[in-house]
Curated annotation (Swiss-Prot):
Binds 2 [4Fe-4S] clusters. [4Fe-4S] cluster 2 binds at residues 38, 41, 50, 54. [4Fe-4S] cluster 1 binds at residues 9, 12, 15, 19. Keywords: 4Fe-4S, Electron transport, Iron, Iron-sulfur, Metal-binding, Nitrogen fixation, Repeat, Transport. The keyword Isomerase does not apply. It comes from Azotobacter vinelandii. Pfam families: Fer4_7 (PF12838). One of its GO terms (molecular function) is metal ion binding. Residues 2-28, 29-65 form the 4Fe-4S ferredoxin-type domain. GO terms for biological process: nitrogen fixation. InterPro entries: 4Fe4S_Fe-S-bd, 4Fe4S_Fe_S_CS. This is Ferredoxin-like protein in nif region.
Amino acid sequence: MALKIVESCVNCWACVDVCPSEAISLAGPHFEISASKCTECDGDYAEKQCASICPVEGAILLADGTPANPPGSLTGIPPERLAEAMREIQAR
């Protein structure tokens, strides 16, 4: 079991203090989750604490590689609408 933090991480430190297994550390350009320490909060919390506090959509991946906070999950803006709005802005 292990989650993964990817390059879109903004190093806000929010996840470090909420990790019950102390599996998150700064290791290069962004934080890293230790695969040997990460329990995905099983037995401690119903939700993965790092993902629940992360302010960046897609910065934390589940073990299967899917985003813990997929596009639209934090903003409430459906990804289709966001893509449409971006096209409208770029067309100006």
